[in-house]
Amino acid sequence: MSIDRRSFIAGTAAVAAQFGFASRVYAEDKIVRFTIAQDFTRIYTFVTSEYNQGQRDYFALVNERGGVGGYKIVADVTDHANDLPRAIEAYERGKREGAVLIDPLSTPVARALVPRALEDKINMITAYSGRSDAADGTAFPYVLPLSINYWTQAGLIIENFKKTEKGSLKGKKIVFVHIDTPFGKEPLSILQVLAQKEGFELLTFPYTPPGNDQSAIWPQVRRARPDFVIFWGAGVGQTVALTEAIRNGLPMDRVSSSVWLSESDMDVVGRDAAKGVMKVEPCVGGREPKVIKDILAEVVAKGKGAGPEAKVGTAYYNYGVQMGALMVEGVRLAAAKAPNGPVTGPWLNDGLRSITNFTAEGLLPPTTVTREDHQGGGMGRIARWDGAKFVPVTDWFAANQDVVWSEIKKNSETFKTTGK
């Protein structure tokens, strides 16, 4: 997939219009500009392509309907390839062009950009990535996960395991297989606290990124005879981990992932072989949500979709719609407060931090973002793969938020003091 510096002005056939040209064509429109600099070519690949497709299709839907609050959405899409110099270049270019938001969809990139976003007052969206302590809006006013962070996801998984064991994990053995990066290591602190609190034994097995070869790890996991397994990665690491878990005979109904597992992963692993595996689900999957049906009817059917129609409704696609909808809701609220702008980072920030009980017409659990809580409430659910789709096995719920917020506050206070 080749992605270069483009402006995607959703709702037109000119989705590949060059950046400057697009700006001139729409000079008569009031616009809000987003920098969508993501990794299309190195590690996250199809994760990014589906997520980005969902975002752009949602922006197209909004613009086809005339925009939001009198504004059109302009999304400048570029490939940073998970490379910090390229990501910083994209960030700085967006800043020069008036972007008020960036979505890098990468933990190392998001971590590197935190000081710039805070200093420049440009809203950085860190959906399912970045620093978990960015949920503390008092420490990170311009870093907004708008989604359940790593720590919350780990807490949800453990709570579901506990429910499976009829309310007690005492004496149980839980294995955590993870990519050996900050993203992969981040849940460890919460898992360690919960191991002490709930009385289970935690065994950890890191693997070298990107995770192409995990053959030495999974026989060790099998020999450990765990009661449950959590595997934690993204992109190729996830499919390799799941393939090895199956090969080593681990029962899929005792294996769970974070949010980073999708239908595309199942196609690689084998849809039938993976039956029973679980994941954290942050929004509704499939094509039943009203907003997905609207995209199909008003964007895709008109030939204005941003990618293959077959990907519409996949997990990663719907994550992109989810985050696009939250961004646009922030614009709507900002425009309601100050219809004539000026469109700045603080202007949008005021809107994003006013989101209240937002569900995108049933796509996501009720989400409320405040100046204190940038996570949005901490709700998710557990879904199980049935061979064709992920089927929810719980309602939306929050779990272990006392432990999660204790960790958030501990780390955010350190950031306030040291900047690290």
Sequence positions of predicted segments:
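Extracytoplasmic "Venus flytrap"
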Residues: 35-56, 78-84, 106, 177-186, ...
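Segments of small-molecule ligand-sensing domains
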Residues: 304-317, 328-394, 419-420
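Extracellular/periplasmic Venus flytrap/periplasmic-binding protein
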Residues: 86, 132-133, 141-249, 286-293
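Beta-alpha junction/loop-to-helix N-cap segments that form part of ligand/metal-binding clefts
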Residues: 31, 46-53, 65-137, 146, ...
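N-terminal secretory signal peptides and thylakoid transit peptides that target proteins
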Residues: 1-20
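Extracellular/periplasmic periplasmic-binding protein-like sensory domains
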Residues: 244-322, 396-400, 411-418
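C-terminal segment of N-terminal export signals and the immediately downstream linker at the start
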Residues: 22-37
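Periplasmic-binding protein-like
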Residues: 94-106, 125-127, 175-177, 225-235, ...
